[in-house]
Structure formats: C-alpha cells, structure tokens
Design a protein with these regions (language model features):
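Hydrophobic pocket/interface hotspot
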Residues: 16-21, 27, 51, 64, ...
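A short, structured loop/turn motif at beta-sheet edges
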Residues: 14, 42, 65-70, 90-99
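Intrinsic-disorder/low-complexity, polar/charged segments enriched in Ser/Thr/Lys/Arg/Asp/Glu/Gln
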Residues: 1-7, 50, 59, 72, ...
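Hydrophobic ligand-binding cavity/cleft-lining segments
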Residues: 1-41, 132, 138-139, 148-152
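Short coil-to-beta-strand transition motifs
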Residues: 32, 56-59
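Hydrophobic/aromatic beta-strand elements that line small-molecule binding cavities or substrate pockets
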Residues: 6-8, 39, 60-66, 77, ...
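Short beta-strand segments that buttress and anchor functional surface loops
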Residues: 49-56, 74-80
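Beta-strand/loop substructures that line and gate deep hydrophobic ligand-binding cavities in soluble
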Residues: 78-128, 133-135, 144-146
Length: 152
C-alpha cells in the first residue's frame, strides 16, 4: 500500500476552489494524465455519485465516498478498477485563499520492493497537477504537461 500527501495554497476563496475541485468532470483541465471524467449516476457531486475516468493508459470507475462542502472530499475507485485508490482532499480557508491537503492511499499492484519507486513517481505527478490547478484557478489559464492549453 502506498500513501503520501501534499498541499497547495491557492489564492482564491474556498467556495470557488471547492466547487471547482468537487466537479470531477473538470479534472482533465488540471491533470494532464486524465482525458475525461463522465458521470455514470443520475446525481453528481454528492456522496454515492459515480463517474468513469479515462486516463492516458487506463480507465477507472470512481465514487464520491464523502463530501463535506468547503471542507473535505473523498474519492475512491470502485472495484475492480485499478489502481485501488482512496483520495482525501481537505480544504481550509487561509489568508483570503484556500489551502488544500491532498492525501493518497493506493494499491498499484506492484511488488513491495518497487512501492517506494512507484510512490515517488505518483507523488511527483500529484505535485505537478496541484501546481496546474493553482495556476488555472489563480490566472484562469494553464498549459498542461502534454501541451494542452486550458482556459476556465
């Protein structure tokens, strides 16, 4: 099992940041590895809402496991999706902006010996993506690692 966390400060109000992040369909706007996120349930943005995510090299089904508006959001993969993932994001209003703490717990299916390498690689991607989220929300535009230019 791989676990890590990172944090980012975004100079935007917590209500704006949370609403943007909680809209899972917007993940491809700040995560270059994700191509699309499509709702698979009638209700979206609530506990139990489900989504299908297509990434560069795989696909997952996701579920909103917990949501406390403007405070926390927990997303999990739905078995048999791989990697097995639980992502918990907490949001705090701070100095007129928002601090996000992003905690990951995942089973990537790699041998235990390779977990540190896999964890470092995953964490590096998360750090880059949080930086892209910050830039997009603060400036209204961002260029992702794959060259896509995104505007809000």
């Amino acid at each position: 099992m791989i676990t890590f966390e990172d944090a980012v400060f975004i100079e935007r109000p917590i209500e704006e940041v949370f609403a943007f992040v909680a809209d899972l369909q917007k993940i491809p706007m700040w995560n270059y590895y994700v191509r699309s996120v499509t709702p698979t349930s009638v209700e979206t943005g609530a506990v139990g809402s489900t989504y299908h995510q297509i990434r560069k090299s795989d696909e997952q089904d996701l579920r909103v496991a917990h949501i406390d508006w403007n405070r926390s959001l927990v997303i999990e993969t739905i078995p048999p999706s791989r990697p097995e993932l639980r992502r918990e994001m907490t949001f705090q209003a701070q100095d007129g902006g928002t601090r996000i703490v992003d905690r990951w717990r995942m089973n990537m299916g790699v041998p235990k010996l390779l977990e540190p390498l896999a964890a470092n690689r995953a964490k590096a991607g998360v750090v880059q993506n949080l930086g892209k989220l910050k830039m997009l929300l603060e400036t209204g535009r961002v260029t992702l690692q794959d060259g896509r230019s995104i505007s809000r």
